[in-house]
């Protein structure tokens, strides 16, 4: 009996690329999934290597122009957005590797989100409010930070993970797990403990959830 291959989209959003904690944790999760009998097909979207276009007036105008009226230039402008949305639609599992920058997400990730949140494509409005259109997916947020924003006194400063959860829910993805790798700048012992705990959580996700 064969099991259908699951498609995994890994979105890396650290500008430090190969020296990124969140990226390394995403790679660790991929390695754990590869050790399972279930087959996975991985797509890596590294926003440091291929940044999403910055949302400007030309993009805004192109997004709200009917498809049949798009000029050749506008077709080129909307091409990255359509590619990103197709990747979301075809993925079974979406992994967002997200370092915290100034209490929120990176500029790279914000530009990507501006490209995928499109009315009629990833969400729509009706009488009862918005409805997400990217349904039936699982998502994992890997949140890394130099400080520890998991404590009672600090968690209110974390604008990263609540925002990402909201965006995912908004476009229809409600099955979301978050793995934290916080305290990486608080000394070697704290960093080692956080890394070990995150790896354990990722192993558990790979074995029991994904």
How would you describe each model-predicted region?
Residues 91-92, 136-137, 173:
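Short, well-ordered alpha-helix to beta-strand connector turns
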Residues 6-7, 41, 137-139, 175:
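Residues at the starts of beta-strands that form the adenosine-phosphate
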Residues 15-17, 147-148, 185-186:
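Short histidine/acidic/glycine/proline-rich micro-motifs that form metal-
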Residues 2-98, 103-114, 118, 200-210:
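N-terminal beta1-alpha1-beta2 submodule of the flavodoxin-like/Rossmannoid cofactor-binding fold
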Residues 2-3, 151-210:
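Glycine-rich phosphate/pyrophosphate-binding loop and the adjoining helix
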Residues 13, 144, 181:
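Cofactor-binding loop segments of dinucleotide-utilizing enzymes, especially the Rossmann-like FAD-
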């Amino acid at each position: 009996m064969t099991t259908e291959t699951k498609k995994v989209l890994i979105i890396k959003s650290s500008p430090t690329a190969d020296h990124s904690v969140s990226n390394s944790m995403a790679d660790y999760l991929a390695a754990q999934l590869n050790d399972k009998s279930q087959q996975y097909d991985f797509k890596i979207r590294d926003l440091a290597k291929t940044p999403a276009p910055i949302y400007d007036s030309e993009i805004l105008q192109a997004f709200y122009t009917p498809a049949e009226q798009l000029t050749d230039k506008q077709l080129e402008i909307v091409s990255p957005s359509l590619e990103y949305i197709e990747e979301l639609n075809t993925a079974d599992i979406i992994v967002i590797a997200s370092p915290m920058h100034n209490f929120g997400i990176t500029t790279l990730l914000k530009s990507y989100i501006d490209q995928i949140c499109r009315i009629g494509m990833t969400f729509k409005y009706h009488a009862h409010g918005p409805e997400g259109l990217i349904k039936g997916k699982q998502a994992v947020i890997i949140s890394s930070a130099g400080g520890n924003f998991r404590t009672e006194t600090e968690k209110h400063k974390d604008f990263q993970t609540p925002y990402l959860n909201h965006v995912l829910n908004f476009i229809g993805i409600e099955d979301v797990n978050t793995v934290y790798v916080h305290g990486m700048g608080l000394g070697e012992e704290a960093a080692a403990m956080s890394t070990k705990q995150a790896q354990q959580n990722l192993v558990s996700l790979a074995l029991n959830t994904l």
